[in-house]
């Protein structure tokens, strides 16, 4: 058993006691008391998030929508790829393949992400990681081979980390480390620069060039990047380029939200 597990359960017990006895935590979606002391209640997690993942349950599987085979966005046509990922007739056959071989995304940013991500990142409600970690674990265990891939947290900007004192992806990685099937592999570092969210799509593609570095002694053949939201995919691409330059053969991406 991982050493972090006992501390994880102690933290959960203390959070439930604090919420139940002193300061009840209200669900940010429905406004009812969250029995686990988390920012979302179990009912909203089950109804708003789990249907996007699917499960072994037939009813949930029928509600899971088809996804793009590359970026994981929900499809609105019968094509296997979304309009951004499929090659058009006019495109050159020499168009380079993405460094990130496939991306798994869980939830739409429009609606759920718009409401919850700013609260998580800007209001210091760090228990969101405890909400999302079981959902990511569920996705990984449903797809053969995913659970065996070491998860590489996308590194934050050092300036952001100094200002906030914490990083939501690192919190998420710590909660995922509780599961014995999952491995966290921290092997990337990032130099300071302009935040991606302030840039256009074209500028995002070049903003991180040379700013993501490999910091480990060894690199596995397959890795999976972990991030909170995918907009243009530029951050994942920059990280994937670095991993492949270090010798990784296949790089996947896993993001909570897609925009």
PLM segments and residue spans:
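Glycine-rich phosphate/pyrophosphate-handling loop used in enzymes and phosphotransfer proteins
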Residues: 1-227, 231-259
């Amino acid at each position: 058993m991982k050493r972090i597990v006992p501390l994880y359960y102690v933290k959960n017990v203390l959070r439930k006691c604090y919420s139940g006895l002193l300061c009840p935590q209200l669900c940010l979606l429905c406004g009812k008391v969250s029995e686990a002391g988390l920012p979302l209640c179990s009912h909203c997690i089950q109804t708003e998030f789990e249907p996007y993942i699917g499960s072994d349950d037939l009813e949930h599987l029928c509600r899971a929508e088809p996804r793009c085979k590359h970026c994981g966005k929900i499809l609105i046509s019968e094509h296997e790829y979304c309009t951004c990922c499929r090659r058009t007739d006019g495109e050159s056959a020499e168009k380079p393949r993405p460094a990130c071989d496939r991306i798994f995304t869980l939830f739409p940013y429009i609606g759920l992400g718009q409401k919850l991500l700013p609260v998580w990142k800007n209001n210091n409600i760090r228990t969101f990681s405890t909400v999302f970690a079981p959902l990511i674990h569920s996705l990984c265990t449903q797809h053969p081979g995913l659970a065996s891939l070491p998860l590489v947290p996308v590194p934050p900007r050092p300036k952001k980390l100094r200002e906030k004192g914490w990083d939501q992806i690192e919190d998420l990685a710590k909660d995922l480390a509780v599961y014995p099937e999952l491995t966290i592999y921290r092997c990337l570092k990032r130099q300071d620069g302009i935040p991606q969210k302030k840039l256009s799509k074209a500028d995002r593609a070049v903003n991180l060039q040379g700013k993501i570095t490999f910091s480990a002694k060894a690199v596995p053949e397959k890795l999976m990047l972990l991030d909170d939201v995918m907009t243009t995919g530029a951050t994942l691409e920059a990280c994937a380029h670095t991993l492949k330059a270090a010798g990784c053969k296949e790089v996947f991406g896993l993001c909570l939200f897609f925009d």
